[in-house]
UniProtKB/Swiss-Prot annotation:
Matches recorded under InterPro entries: Trm112-like
Similarity remark: Belongs to the UPF0434 family.
One Pfam family this sequence matches: Trm112p
Source lineage: Bacteria, Pseudomonadati, Pseudomonadota, Gammaproteobacteria, Cellvibrionales
Position of the signal peptide: none
The protein's name: UPF0434 protein TERTU_2813
């Protein structure tokens, strides 16, 4: 679980858009950039080189 205060101040380093926490995958997802940032040992890894691209299905799911 990620601290809600931390989540409220973190933004995607690529798009500067807000992030959504996905607990079952332990990732922070940015719908705007289509990237998912991993959380390792409770620490968000906010590097573009460490992020994975969202699938088309995921992009549709997270673009509210």
């Amino acid at each position: 679980m990620i601290d809600q205060k931390l989540l409220s101040i973190l933004v995607c380093p690529v798009s500067k858009a807000p992030l959504e926490f996905v607990a079952d995958k332990q990732e922070l997802v940015c719908a705007a950039s289509g990237l998912a940032y991993p959380i390792r040992d409770g620490i968000p890894v906010m590097l573009e080189t460490e992020a994975r691209e969202l699938t088309l299905e995921e992009k549709e799911q997270y673009s509210h």
